[in-house]
């Protein structure tokens, strides 16, 4: 675009570390040792130093131009503001962003976006699906699509076991955290050569329920296909039940989806086919890259 920094009005970031700060801090006090708490707070300070980096490398002060937009608000904006619709129900879900894993909104053209429900970390459909993805031998960040595809080759015979791990909660769902190993209860993505990597999320109790995890070079067997099928169908049922509950309560005809979990095209197809919403709208990119555009669209 050949723009200079002084020609840019605002720099919008699809994270806001102050959002859910109270919830994050209280969670840390309950679950982390003091050293880890300090490390987390230091990371927050580092993330806020974007203006310092810009000043260092470009010799330009942008501190008054940087706007931090809550993560899921940016996600859902990347869907709603691309559409020519008057109103919709917004549903954003992923692993976690600003400590929220699900946020549900009322979306109306010309009005402020209104959040009506949210689910906080560590209850997360994204982390739940990711743990199974690792267990099935797909270790790379973003490998969940392989499990979604594998599901079509199996039968959902392990749904009863999955129901031991994820259950209906007061707002949406709750995870039995004893089946997970979150390493100090907060997941960190470390980066090596630009690629995120992380430890296994499933615990020994998880392995007692489903057996030995598949190695990355092990053959894919019937049990792996059936676990994938059971996982996929369980997620579809959980999400469909929730959006139908929301449809009945709020009477919206349109549904906007966003967040990393909405990359699950099989789930999206089931929503189109089985839900009572008239239309489903998606972001051009429901992941974090699209959320960056959503942050700018919202602001």
Task: Annotate the PLM regions.
Residues 1-299:
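Short acidic/glycine-rich loops and adjacent helix/strand connectors
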């Amino acid at each position: 675009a050949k723009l200079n920094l002084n020609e840019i009005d605002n720099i919008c970031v699809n994270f806001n570390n102050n959002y859910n700060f109270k919830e994050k801090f209280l969670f840390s006090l309950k679950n982390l040792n003091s050293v880890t708490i300090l490390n987390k707070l230091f990371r927050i300070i580092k993330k806020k130093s974007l203006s310092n980096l810009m000043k260092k490398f470009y010799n330009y002060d942008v501190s008054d131009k940087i706007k931090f937009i809550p993560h899921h608000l940016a996600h859902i904006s990347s869907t709603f503001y691309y559409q020519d619709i008057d109103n919709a129900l917004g549903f954003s879900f992923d692993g976690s962003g600003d400590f929220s894993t699900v946020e549900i909104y009322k979306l109306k053209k010309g009005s402020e976006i209104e959040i009506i429900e949210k689910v906080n970390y560590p209850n997360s459909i994204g982390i739940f699906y990711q743990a199974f993805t690792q267990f099935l031998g797909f270790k790379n960040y973003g490998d969940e699509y392989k499990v979604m595809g594998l599901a079509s080759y199996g039968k959902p015979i392990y749904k009863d076991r999955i129901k031991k791990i994820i259950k209906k909660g007061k707002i949406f769902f709750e995870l039995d955290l004893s089946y997970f190993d979150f390493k100090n209860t907060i997941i960190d993505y470390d980066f090596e050569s630009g690629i995120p990597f992380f430890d296994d999320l499933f615990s020994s109790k998880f392995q007692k329920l489903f057996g030995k995890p598949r190695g990355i070079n092990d053959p894919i067997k019937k049990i792996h296909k059936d676990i994938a099928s059971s996982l996929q169908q369980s997620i579809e049922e959980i999400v469909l039940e929730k959006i139908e509950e929301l449809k009945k309560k709020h009477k919206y005809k349109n549904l906007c989806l966003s967040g990393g979990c909405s990359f699950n095209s099989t789930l999206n197809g089931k929503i189109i086919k089985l839900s009572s919403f008239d239309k489903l709208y998606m972001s051009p990119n429901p992941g974090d890259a699209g959320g960056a555009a959503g942050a700018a669209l919202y602001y």
